[in-house]
Amino acid sequence: MKLPKLLLLASMMSPILATSSYAAPYPSGVTLDETQEITLNNGAEVTSIDPAKQAAEPAFNLGRDLFEGLVIQDKQGKTIPGVAESWSVNDNNTVYTFHLRDAKWSNGETVTAQDFVYSWQRLLNPSTASPYAWFAAIPNIENSQAIMKGDAAPESLGVKALDEKTFQVTLEEPIPFFTKLLSHPVLAPVHKATIEKHGNRWTQPEHIVTNGAFTVSEWKVNEKLVMVKNTHYWDASNVVLEKVTWLPIGDANVVLNRYLAGEIDQAVSIPAAQKKKLIQQRPQEVASTSASLGSTFYYLNTQQGPTKDVRVRKALSYAIDRQLLTSAILRNGGVPMYTLVPPQTDGFKSHTPEFATWNRHKRIEKAQQLLSEAGYDKSNPLKLTFTVPTFSMDVKMATTMAGMWKSRLGAQVTIKQLEPKVFYALKEPTDITRGGWTADYNEASTWLDIFVSSGEYNDSRYNNPQYDELMARSKTMSNPSELYLQAESMLIEDMAIIPIYRPGNDQYLIKPYVGGYELTNPESSYYRKNVYVKAH
């Protein structure tokens, strides 16, 4: 793995220095508008903006702007300093020491090393019930697994404040991508006194204290969340935007209509039926995304119902025409997938499964054969429940897939639509559940860790001791690629999921007066601190 910072060898420690110079907030020659405000769509209402309670991309979008961790990412996904202006690691790569800059909370108080100690302990504490606690355990921080299981006190976590500005982390085993993990929003600090005073209401606009580029001024659930510039942010002089209004709209058609009416400044998902025409009519508003580290798949319940039978799971996967879905339904640059991990992931290239090499006719024939062997026919049709959020494209995809299964397998599929907030909180998966993952960090384990038997987001309820062993062994290796390949091949052979597509290069609409908002980060980690409004 590439080290994100310059490594300088010394006798006992290897200081990693912040070599990135911060660019000017906007290019020379640009005239700024007097009103620095934008309105964006977040896709859904969030369950929480508390870093420890965030669990999906809409919340992470807000989290990156409100709270800043030790490091952040640049527009290409490289790790750059955040609250930590430099750090060092010992010769064994097990002790990291972070040196904090003069950062402030939005109430003017100093961000300290103890804030990180408190926040990371709180994240892993079972009483917090963080849906992303598992993520904090990935880096092998001393005692993290035991704390998460309730077998050790949160105070035993291998983190300490050496002084107000020095935060130290001790790992049980070295992990080559440790610093890459640290830009994730759930590892940002929170303000202890505010939480202790206001409890679960600490994130309300009248109470919240943040350390990111913005803070919250207004939040009307299911209507809008308004952020304003945090004047105490350490890099506030380079933050141009004064206000960001986020809307929780799940329907791409509604988003587009509001964009065309001038009420939203960006439309990332253009409905396929209107896309070609709009791109031709508005060339000055067209921008392109780069292929992000994402993977869209569908969970198959491996523990109960018809999908408990691997023959049924394989039949469902084989019967899907991925090329048709991506070219005729999605029409967003998506690339068909037959495995889990995207090919542009650092240090990893999936083995192509045999069924991916078959032609369409052979796949359907094999699917029908497997379903017959499983005991299903016209007199005993396969009946399934397929759960998706109410996003228009998810419903359209599910309807098309259900049609394929009906025409090719005689399956009777009931599509269960849930509001996004309800869907993301779903605890018990049905036969088929909409899945997908955008990388938390650029390494194959961000996807493969999902499917260990104890995985928080293992909605397939996949339970394979051999898979668990491979992933456990991978944590102690400096180059675990071969184990990752074995694990992914096992997952696909067991067909715990139906991989469908990965994001490719796509085009979207953005108002020509919005600058600094290039969608080029492979992990889709974007920061509104980089955005500005040009005079128009």
Per-region residue spans from a language model:
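Gly/Pro-rich hinge or "lid" segments in bacterial periplasmic/extracellular proteins
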Residues: 145, 150-156, 160, 165, ...
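Alpha-helical secondary-structure segments
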Residues: 113-119, 164-170, 174, 212-213, ...
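A structural "hinge/loop" feature
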Residues: 25, 44-60, 83, 131-132, ...
